[in-house]
């Protein structure tokens, strides 16, 4: 599982409501943009943080692999200068009850930001040239702590990691039952389908 941070001030309303993120495949001048290419590196179960208007507003779980897709019609005139040829990744977004400003937590987050393709500038403002940034597990852990400390309940049960963890807990409970080993194996097999 990988972790990502999307800067999408212009399109976050459409993308959160629509359950996706979208970017053009290239910059306006035709050059490659690593933060657009990053959409192709996402896999189901990956976690994505939504950043817009200076706040982390939602957390999403990637549902499907990236696919080539024209610019969504619901963008309207937003991004008129973007190419119509783009990448789309479907996500299951969960809006935060209490969005928070990463800039207010720069003492914690600053040292954890990636050196290259950082989603934030050193002053804590969003990096306008960065769309989808890869972040490491340390930054993810810090974001989760801040999200929870801000009064949010986090449900990422859609992720593969959480599904596997839940299965392990259930299998552990079955293993502790005082029944024959063959019955335990059958129960575990029936849970897996």
Task: Give names to the regions the model predicted.
Residues 1-12, 26-33, 71-190:
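Contiguous surface segments at macromolecular interaction interfaces
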Residues 56-67:
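Short beta-strand-centered aromatic/proline hotspots
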Residues 39-43:
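Short, well-ordered loop/turn sites that connect or cap secondary structure elements
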Residues 18-21:
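Intrinsically disordered, low-complexity regulatory segments
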Residues 34-38:
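A structural connector/turn signal
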